[in-house]
Amino acid sequence: MEWDTVIGLEVHAQLKTKSKLFSGASTAFGATPNSQTSFIDAGLPGVLPVLNEQAIIMAIQFGLAIHGTINDLSVFERKNYFYPDLPKGYQISQYQKPIVTNGYLNIQLGNNLEKTVHIARAHLEEDAGKSLHDAHTDYTGIDLNRAGTPLLEIVTTPCLYSAEEAINYLKTLHQLVRFLGICDGNMQEGSFRCDVNLSIKPKGSSVLGTRTELKNLNSFRFIEKAIAFEQARHQDILESGLSVIQETRLYNPDNNTTQAMRGKENENDYRYFPDPDLLPIHIDKEQIEEIKNNLPDLPEAISKELKNTPSLNDEDINFILSSPDTYQYYKKIKSLCSAADKTIINWLKGQYAAFLNEHTLTFETPPISAKTMAAFLSKIHEKKISSSIAKNIFSMLCAGEEDIDAIIEREGYQQQNDNSALEEIVEQIIKQYPEQVTEYKAGKEKLLAFFIGQAMKQTKGKANPEQINLLLKKHLG
């Protein structure tokens, strides 16, 4: 029997606010357990939450970026459940009146296909604390540093039908929240986590099957493997004549399986009701318009613009959009530099990227400023230095030097463009290698690169390769 897989995703994006959603405690990652916990985060009686306005602005930014509806009235509600790392006994979230509804995100699939993923809602809520099972041998510790950190929960409709679609959507969403500047996207630190709701149904059926929820996945690779395992598990159960249990499961990467965590709750089980300590949020059109006018450049629009640059291919564009810092670095260089787009991107994704990887650096803290890199690439474009000399200069720039003209002067790197001097060198090379000349004239044209190499060797890389190329062709006939 053939089956259709149906997937809906819930992503928790941790917002890049300096303080928590309802308290002034810091959201910095990695602090000593419980050192960033206020009375509000700890759920002590007699304290009242105060809403972080920056979180509202970030949620509106996201809503605008996904073409969603920003609701003029939004309400916080208490989501009631018991868990050791939830000291209040409830989580402040949004249910009936979220801040954003009815958005979408376009994703790219194979064979140049595009799919629109419908986003049902995006709402604000506070994160829970963290249970530390390995910190002690005979009991579990609770760290409330994370409790109260603002999350934007982004919920799709069940409109994804394969692991490929799910991963492409998640990568596109991950890219978007980073370019918006609302989430750092650090999956290892839990800043971007995903719950997968999955069911299968007979192929072509309009009736959805019983779903299971895979909780707190924080790796694209693990998400893909968890979906594949859960698809196969559902299929085995149904083809054995049994029924899938609606439950929450955890993925175990050590043995690539999922295991039951608890029965899956329905929304009614949480007994949502409006939080009496928080006023409804009223958002006016003027505020939305102001935020819209200050949105940064976003990946979809940038990609369309870059595709109009004939010299850039998809690989180049993907590299430029690999992070907001990479894009901003490229954009700054392009604004200051006379070099062609392809020259810029070849250097950035070639030698520069290799250096960054080798030294565990990123374009967030580049070893060469965009201004210096632009000046360097302009020298190459203007043929003031050869490509081989450029590699030497680049190494010096990576080591901390900044004055390119001083390097050229000190090292004697000025490009040799004297036509008569270069012509003498070409004539000497032709006399020096008569056998290769005969082979070249017999049709072995690849030997031209050999002759150019000899000329560059004699001039210690200072000759203009294009001039050498023309002179060789002239003398070799």
Swiss-Prot record:
Signal peptide: none annotated. One of its GO terms (molecular function) is ATP binding. PROSITE patterns: GATB. Its EC number is 6.3.5.-. GO terms for biological process: glutaminyl-tRNAGln biosynthesis via transamidation; translation. Belongs to the GatB/GatE family. GatB subfamily. PANTHER family: GLUTAMYL-TRNA GLN AMIDOTRANSFERASE SUBUNIT B MITOCHONDRIAL AND PROKARYOTIC PET112-RELATED (PTHR11659), GLUTAMYL-TRNA(GLN) AMIDOTRANSFERASE SUBUNIT B, MITOCHONDRIAL (PTHR11659:SF0). This is Aspartyl/glutamyl-tRNA(Asn/Gln) amidotransferase subunit B.
